[in-house]
Amino acid sequence: NPDKVVINVAGDGCFRMNMNEIATATRNNMPLIQVVINNHVLGMVRQWQTLFYDHRYSNTVLNDKVDFVKLAEAMGAVGIRVTKKEELADAIKKAIDLITTVVLV
């Protein structure tokens, strides 16, 4: 359905592992909206460590300060920073109206 709006929601750990999809989307002029939930954790890895390694965590906390807006822009996408939940609806509307690849952080 190429005429449909595509919104993908991922944590920052997932986005770090798969962010090359943004470069592919911009190269192919795809109107994709990527929402990044920045909780500073490799969530799935941590979940597996909780379930199978008795809560012994290794390298799952992401303490660095990656600027995902700048990263999006470096890949040719539009980056929009959302700092309050009250801003989210307007940011999503703006992203849809832009009809391009957008990363909401």
Label the predicted regions.
Residues N1-V105:
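Thiamine diphosphate
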